[in-house]
Each structure stands twice: as structure tokens, then as C-alpha cells.
Design a protein with these regions (language model features):
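Histidine-centered divalent metal-coordination motifs
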Residues: 6-10, 113-114, 181, 215, ...
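Binuclear metal-dependent hydrolase catalytic cores centered on His/Asp/Glu-rich metal-binding motifs
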Residues: 139-177, 196-203
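Conserved beta-sheet core of the metallophosphoesterase superfamily
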Residues: 106-109, 126-127, 189-254
Length: 254
């Protein structure tokens, strides 16, 4: 199987991967591109401009969440209904395009913190499988999947509370492979060395330590301090920033 994460609107790269492989594809969330921290591109830039996005990124990177919220509130000071409609239209267009690249892929897809579940499921082509949280057998492996991001303070739709993440993980029971969008709360895996943010899940870490899956695959951190890290008996591996690399992780490794 091939696992990818953080597609963020990389339509051409995703279409090329689907065309080039006959392996089972697993997509670990964040299909659309709200904001690219490298280029300032994305839906937010179309709504508010790159200078605004640059300031938002600065505030988020510095952990000034209240100021980031205030900055977003300023954008909404105009016609709120118009802004809401423009945002919805851009999201719909983004999902239509990226999900179109999964035509014929027969992929397993979960969600990340930026994803809108209802829209994602509506545009996902027939033959692909959306899984919010649950168990699968893939190529003979017992696989547990739990989508969703960790709380950021910005009330992003795809985020889960710590308690809800723990509840969904607990419902899996033991698995051989754990797939999540977020990393475990391990400093080397949760820290983005470029953005300076840290987004690890304590619930995921506790699950890994308790149930000891052989492998844990995840995304969310685009430029991690470490790609691989052994936690207890589990090899934890970042599936990579697909928008930038166009590559996934093969399991089992060749």
C-alpha cells in the first residue's frame, strides 16, 4: 500500500500518482489547500490577499492565537454573508478538483484538520472509501484509522477535542497499523522546524504505548524534526508533505 498525507490541492501530483500505481492508496487527510506556509497560496489568500496571510502565519507561528482570531474577525467586518458564500464556493471548487484526481483510485480516505467532511464525502468518486474512524483490513494487515486534527484554538472544522480523539482511538482496540492525520505527542515528530508549530496528540501517544501497533503512519507536520521515530514497540512514520513532494510512503518498505 501507499500512504500519503497533506495533499493540499496538489491535483496534478495526485493524478500522476493514481495513474502510476496499482497499489492500495491511503490518504491521511488535508485534501484542500487553505494556506501554503511556503508560498502563501490557498483559499485564504484568495479571500484576503497574501499580505494578510503572511501576517496570519506570523501570529500563528508565534502562538498569538487571540490576535490571529482578531485578524480573521477584521476580514469578516464587511458583508459576512458574501464572505461566507465566497468561502463556500472556493471550498466546493477545491474538493471537486482534488477529488476528481482520485477517479479510479479505489483509495481509502480520511480527514485532516482543514477538511470539511460533508463536502469531501460528496465529491469523493465512486469506488473510493471515506472513513472517519474505524477498522479495515488492507493487504492482510489489520488497520485502524482515525481522522481529524488536534485543537488549535482557531475552531477549525476538522479538529477533534482530546477526549473525542481518545474515544475514537479506544474504540479501535489493538491493530497492526495505526493511521491518523496527527502525530503522537512526541517532540521530534510534532514540531515543524520551519513553522515552529507543535501539533501532537497525547491521545494518539497513549494509544500507541498501550496497544503497541507495529506501525503508525500520520501527516499534519509538513517539515518535522524527525520523519521516523520508535515509540515503545511502534515505528512511527510521517507519510510526508505530498503537496511539496508528490511522494508517499510504501508499506511495507521495499
Amino acid at each position: 500500500m501507499i500512504l500519503i498525507a497533506d495533499v493540499h490541492g496538489a491535483v496534478t501530483k495526485l493524478r500522476a500518482l493514481v495513474a502510476a500505481t496499482d497499489e492500495q492508496l491511503v490518504v491521511l487527510g488535508d485534501l484542500i489547500n487553505f494556506v501554503d506556509y511556503r508560498t502563501m497560496d490557498g483559499i485564504l489568500a484568495e479571500l484576503a490577499g497574501r499580505d494578510w496571510v503572511r501576517r496570519l502565519i506570523q501570529l500563528r507561528t508565534e502562538g498569538r492565537i487571540d490576535e490571529a482570531r482578531a485578524l480573521w474577525s477584521k476580514v469578516r467586518e464587511g458583508d459576512a454573508n458574501d464572505l461566507q458564500q465566497r468561502t463556500a464556493d472556493l471550498i466546493e471548487a477545491a474538493y471537486e478538483e482534488i477529488c476528481g484526481a482520485l477517479e479510479g483510485a479505489d483509495a481509502v480516505v480520511t480527514f485532516g484538520n482543514v477538511d470539511r467532511l460533508e463536502v469531501l464525502q460528496r465529491y469523493l468518486p465512486e469506488g473510493n472509501t471515506f472513513i472517519e474512524a474505524g477498522l479495515l483490513e488492507i493487504e492482510g494487515w489489520a488497520v485502524g484509522v482515525v481522522g481529524g486534527g488536534v485543537p488549535s484554538g482557531l475552531r477549525v472544522p476538522g479538529e477533534l477535542s482530546d477526549d473525542e480523539m481518545a474515544r475514537r482511538l479506544s474504540a479501535l482496540g489493538p491493530v497492526e497499523i495505526l493511521c491518523t492525520h496527527v502525530p503522537p505527542a512526541v517532540p521530534q515528530l510534532q514540531r515543524d522546524v520551519v513553522g515552529g508549530t507543535q501539533k501532537g496528540s497525547q491521545a494518539v501517544l497513549e494509544y500507541v504505548l498501550e496497544h503497541r501497533p507495529q506501525f503508525h503512519y500520520f501527516g499534519d507536520i509538513h517539515q518535522p524534526q524527525a520523519i521516523n521515530w520508535v515509540v515503545g514497540d511502534t515505528l512511527c512514520k510521517n507519510a510526508g508533505y505530498f503537496r511539496a513532494t508528490g511522494r508517499g510512503v510504501h508499506h511495507p518498505a521495499a
